[in-house]
């Protein structure tokens, strides 16, 4: 397949800076000439999780989750924190951890295609609580990437102690840039 030459302009460089691309941008880079500026998969999926979180009625904390195939080619499920399907769109309590809402991870896991027998990655705007971590371990998730660390690290601790790869968004994004996985 023949790729057309990409003209790398100052506008492209500014776009890349706004998107958070931190590596040196040069028209001499063959990947830049061929592809222009592209976000990493970690950034792409975390952006999707952020957008999904906007569907939440939780006024205190909106959380979004996306589950994808490990090769980044398929979205398997999305979820956000909220009430059960016909439930009211209101909190049981404004006290942290007692909203009564179903967690974003649970909503995504309930809808996930379990006939998909390949490694799955989960991107979540906030790290999971311990109860959600237990469900994640039962769901054959190979990697979890979180945006913001939850007030209690028990969920992350449990996942890591059971051998699940857990990365902050910053770690996942840097790893992809280092290995240039996002160019594929």
What are these model-derived regions, one by one?
Residues 1-11:
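Extracellular adhesion/carbohydrate-binding repeat motifs centered on closely spaced tryptophans
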Residues 3-4, 15-20, 24-184:
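Zinc-dependent deaminase catalytic domain
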